[in-house]
């Protein structure tokens, strides 16, 4: 892939910016976007919540509606809020007939599992909460040809057709003689599925997918570069308890009827004329440093006002730093997410990022959730 896309993937000349296989990762992303790729997602943490009160527990903890027969067989992206209505966690819940499976990141998973256990105990709920991470593994398959490639290896190819398999649905398929739960979703902005299966079946399914000629794509594309081109938020980076769900622009159009933790504060925030800050997408408009070297920043960068040279501070005293940053090879820019004060959260607003003692011009490309790549989100639903 690197040979194929060498002219589209920058060479990072500065030693600090080049401490990773960035060019390989970027080339993999471009190939996935042009054709198809599979990604090892075995780092997912999984928790099963069952028992008579399992829906009641999750209805209380989650901002999204979990109950109701209409949600059975669906994947629900949702959040835990704290009592202040700020974002404590994000994850996907698979609403199964007799239980819910919470699919989480490896870092936040154990934390959220123990939190659920404590809340269930405090509220006297009859639930069983089990860590099933070691029992299952996940493979992502994405790209414009994901359906075609997956149809080569499933027993019932017609079941994958667009009308038969709606976006966000979960269906059982068979690959290489193994039962697989296919979840039609995308964190990389392309058509495709998460494939969930027993851990012991992972290698057989992986080999079957590879036999179609698809490339294996590293997790950098999933976790950073394409994620930022899609304006997707990362827990413990962009989603933190210092900011609320509206500032992260992840609030649903309507608030569910059922009570949930943080609901009162969430309603209070919704009634505001505007939020104190908004999570915005920034692009660096010039990345050449004083030595004439193009920089590709990593880490956390202060966001400055170009007129004063001072770090931006919102009305609650929160300072603006990049919460995520990566080079997006499809867009061809360094892209960052950062919470900006309402006064500065305007598309086209000129800002400055500080990196290693130097300043680089940037501008606000989007306020709130607004992808730079495929802004209408047509590709994942294709």
What residue ranges belong to the model's regions?
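Conserved, structured C-terminal
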Residues: 1-4, 9-20, 26, 96-382
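Acidic, proline/glycine-enriched N-terminal capping motif
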Residues: 1-78, 86
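Membrane-targeting and insertion segments and their boundary/processing signals
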Residues: 28-32, 83, 90, 176-183
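Short, well-ordered loop/turn elements at secondary-structure boundaries
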Residues: 33, 42-43, 88, 95-98, ...
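Internal amphipathic helical hairpin motif
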Residues: 52-87, 144-178
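Well-ordered mid-protein domain cores that form the structural environment of catalytic cofactors
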Residues: 60-122
